[in-house]
Amino acid sequence: MISRKIISTINSKTFYNKSLSYCTVNNNKNTTININNNNEKPKIKTGILMLNLGGPSKLEEVEPFLTRLFTDKEIFKLPFQKYTGTLIAKRRSNAVMKLYEAIGGGSPIRKWTEKQGELLSSMMDKISPETAPHKHYIGFRYSDPLIADTLDQMENDNVERVVAFSQYPQYSCTTTGSSLNNLWKTLEEKQMQSKFKWSVIDRWQDHKGFIDATIHKIKKAYNQFNSKLRELDIDDVDANNNNNNNKPVLVFSAHSLPMSTVEKGDPYPQEVAETVCRVMDGLGIRDEETGKPLEYILAWQSKVGPLPWLSPKTSFVIEQLAKKGRNAIVIPIAFTSDHIETLSEIDIELQHLAKKCGMKLLVRSESLNDDPLIISAMADLVNTHLKSNKTIHSNQYHLKCPGCKDDSTFCRTISNPIQALKL
């Protein structure tokens, strides 16, 4: 529908335009006319598809979420995958529901992704009018809105170009790779390969805006730590006469991975480590007495099952620090918004463990959520990406994991790329 306001005093006549319907204007009256364009839809010039694994927004979504998760061969390799994964999901759903009940009855990840997307699109319209209008879309892997439904919405909106924007700063085949693989496969299944022109933001672990936003949150947490330390009046000398109780250890916590995935060459651990190093290089917080930077460690959370995963576990690190009389600031380094890993695992389970082990003070650095710094970082990422004449993905995008033997994966390709590059 195209609306045009025509305010004029003209002779009564009927006119016709090839792309418009017949319209009649009356004599000597100010007339407002809505003219239907039946041949053209208003276009969304740039769609921003925000990719994430998702999370159940309501308790009744928990079991379907777990079923999609445990039947995904890119995440878990199970015998008789569909049957076994469905059975595991059914058995775990009640326990997982209780975790979501404790954080408000569902994951806030959709809420935060919507908020980030709205702010991002609005900012993009201002800083990049030539690629406007921009509209964000959400494509979750295991919960609504699923990618298949979002593609239908984009088709209905007449989107021209889409940036597939991973909400995981560090690339892993189990997160970004799985989402992209599902995206390209779904396009093929729906015979929509030629509907949109695509490009990909597949990793951004070293982006300055992301690093700066993380540093900002750590500094805020450090100030909170010192304030709470004064309130608690904690003695700053431990049992070994080490003057270190008032110096927190920075515990960077990221979602873990099975070692079987890591040993295939998944780049996630090295990219998380790169983020940590860049944050520490720019943090600038130093001990007032020694002038040295704060001590830090990278740990891993959310292990599932009995098989080996990345270590040390975040819970193990907290236990050991507590035994040594140390305190900690925990920093979620691979998440851009709050969800069950921050609100339940860190804020509830890890805090309980810290108290049980005798740790006097554990503070969590806030998630990025809708902080203006992370929105600006995302806008800079997308804007730079759109302005590039050559780059439609990262330099590392086409490099498959050395141990990957699955020739059916699409995760290192791009369906109908925006530019005619050799893929």
UniProtKB/Swiss-Prot annotation:
Localization annotation: Mitochondrion inner membrane
Transit peptide: 1-29
One term under GO cellular component: mitochondrion
Chief site of localization: mitochondrion
Binding site for [2Fe-2S] cluster: C173, C401, C404, C411
EC primary class: lyase
SUPFAM superfamilies according to UniProt: Chelatase
Note accompanying the cofactor annotation: Binds 1 [2Fe-2S] cluster.
Pathway where this protein functions: Porphyrin-containing compound metabolism; protoheme biosynthesis; protoheme from protoporphyrin-IX: step 1/1
A family per Pfam: Ferrochelatase
Keywords: 2Fe-2S, Heme biosynthesis, Iron, Iron-sulfur, Lyase, Membrane, Metal-binding, Mitochondrion, Mitochondrion inner membrane, Porphyrin biosynthesis, Transit peptide
Gene Ontology molecular-function annotations: 2 iron, 2 sulfur cluster binding; ferrochelatase activity; metal ion binding
EC number(s) per entry: 4.98.1.1
GO biological process terms held by the UniProt record: heme biosynthetic process
Coiled-coil zones: none
Membrane topology category: Peripheral membrane protein
Annotated catalytic residues: H207, D380
UniProt-listed InterPro entries: Ferrochelatase, Ferrochelatase_AS, Ferrochelatase_C, Ferrochelatase_N
UniProt catalytic activity: heme b + 2 H(+) = protoporphyrin IX + Fe(2+)
Assembly notes: Monomer.
Cited HAMAP family: Ferrochelatase
Family: Belongs to the ferrochelatase family.
Purpose: Catalyzes the ferrous insertion into protoporphyrin IX.
Name of the protein in its database record: Ferrochelatase, mitochondrial
Name of the gene encoding the protein in the UniProt record: hemH
